[in-house]
Amino acid sequence: EALGLNKVKNPVTCGYLEMYNNKDKITLPVKMDSRFLIGPEGAHLNISGISGLAAKTSYAMFLLKAIQDKCYEADSEDDVAFVFFNVKGKDLLAIDQPAEFDNESDKERVYGQYTKLGLTTLPFKNVHYYYPYSAKKVGNTYLSKEAYNEQRINGNAKLYKYDCEDDMKKLDMLFASIEDPNQTMDSIINYIANEQGNFRGLDDWADFLEVVKENCQAGKKNDEISVGSWRKFNRVIRNSIYNNPMFGRIADDNEQTRLEDSLKHIKKNEVHVIDIAKLNEDMQGFVFGDAIR
């Protein structure tokens, strides 16, 4: 009571304190006002710690799981949805599976702590995974083929791709880190987004690259954009799109999807995990920007 831990409004568990009364150890659950995490007062949460130990990631996942538990309570009027980005290895690609323990005593100890904190010992619920499309039919991921197939059979894994007809207007995100002092790249991107010239009606990336190449030819006249600018644009685009299986038509097989289509139908208490761990830095930025936009 002296710490005010019993007076927190909209409480969500964020950890516990161990204190001693003489020789007796007392464990006190610590709760914070959930509005400062996910409500109208929400802001960034800073978690500090030693790099390489996965401690910061583990605590972030603990806190997010506590939030989902709170929103799943029968009398809760709150709901929340999560979008995670898996950026290293396969750390976040099995969060719907029970945790593994080295021995039974560790399991009992950890589960006991969760119970004292008023949390369930169940993994995340309503989890959906998205992997970069690959010609290998498994996805460009660190996840094993067996694990991916199990997720696919369970109906919670899809391969994401970018379709020319629908995603041609998103190419500006590939130039986020490209210096463009004269805004010539912006001019080209707007030219394409407005389907000017021969960009109208394109539905295939190979045709798109061919039209870009045509604009790079010497003597090609464009009142607004120079050939040199088109050549710079072409270099960046070809490095990202050419022979990249992520850029292609979406097959009508319920296994391939556009991230935009999946995320705009996100439902309450769902968890969507987007794997970008094996993508290069530019493509990671592109996928992240697409999801956030």
Where are these regions (language model features)?
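Glycine-rich phosphate-binding loop of nucleotide-binding enzymes
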Residues: N22-P123, H128
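P-loop NTPase motor domains
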Residues: C71-E77, F85, G89-A94, T121-R293
